[in-house]
Amino acid sequence: MRFILVEGSEQFKPEYWNRIVAVFTTGQTWQFKNYKWHDPDELFKHTLGIFVGWRGDQAPDNIRGWGHRVLSTGIDRWRGEGHDASRFRDKEIVEHIWRAIEDNMRARGWRKDRAPAAL
């Protein structure tokens, strides 16, 4: 399966919205102004939300308010040269994100040979 990562939805055609598998969010609702579903509660009924913050920091209030529909995960802060022992955990986080995306896709009817008719 091939994935296409895009920075924004400005160039989206209507049929693209049925192929969205995840939305990375900063927690600011203005980022959804050009989306088919402007309201985060509605958006995350149709697709998985993902927030990546710093390990040990609490996610912003907006993200916590969106509940279980947004995966909130954290990476270690960069501590400078010679302190990169924690970088191996980045791979764990990336694998966790991909697992969540794939699990969500299966739950919504995605298969290797076809996408669901509608999200």
Where are these regions (language model features)?
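Extended amphipathic alpha-helical regions
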Residues: 1-119
